[in-house]
Amino acid sequence: AGVATCESLVRRWGGRRAEEGDGLVQVGGHLTEHVTFILPRLPLVRSGEPSHGTVWLSLDTDDICHLPSKSGHPTRSKRPEHDDTYRMSEKLASAWKAFLRWRDGAGKGIPVTLFVVAEQLDDPRFADHLRQLLDSDSAVTIASHGNRHRCWSAWPADPFGLQTDLSLSLRRLAEFAGDSFRPWFRAPGGYAAPWMAAPLAAAGVSLDSSVNPSWLTRRKAGPNRNWTSVSEAVRSEGLVERQWLTAHSLPVTGPALRIPLLSILARHSWKRATKGMSCASEMTLMSPEQPVDSLYWHLLDHARRGASWSPPLHPTLESA
């Protein structure tokens, strides 16, 4: 496993670093450095234990400057690449306040994962909001949405660049979020390709949630425009793939929540998927044989409707 994954497990299950086990090991016919961690206790998993959780909620924290029309995309962006220091927009600041109100109200106690762009930690206001959330809300987990929100599959394949970028984001987020961190990944902009699976595994990612299996979005799935190939590549590397919910092969998560016509289908699909259901436990989420409906939105959505917007969850949805 990657170092970020190991450190996350060690913190969670009371393990420790075991330098006495370090050394060289043979991997793929080559000697490589090996570091050791020990987990003295592990969660008890009963064989055949039923799983009642069927819904996983998450949101992406990317800002206006991260839109593919602004940056990160080789042809769509006004500035495909830049070195500007991130500063949070006033719209996202407003969305943060609305999201925190939702967490204190209708969203209280409901597990949710925030996929954070690591460079956002450079802005003191963003970091303060995230710290406030983590200190007051134990139902929140943090995962990676990349370091600078680069639309990777829109560019020529760059495994080394992706692994480097992702390793940096995982390390920064793990240091900031502590026990709330999870080594999970969502591709910025939903741009994912089969070649990305190996760098994800090498960086220590254990779960990917980048696949939007709709014909409308297949241009984002690499040169072959095939979401099945992306999912198979991810699973072949030993990662769990949690693809986004669709309806009639149409997207119903993320941007679909605000796109005319699609938004009607999206709201209906969310209500149906969450009616009388409960949120998936982490054990269920990490068990690839267990079906889970993955629903996600954007933090910026909370700035809509005069900062009164909230995800269209059915009121009967229960926490794990």
What do the predicted segments below correspond to?
Residues 35-46, 179, 186-294:
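Active-site-adjacent pocket scaffolds in enzyme catalytic domains
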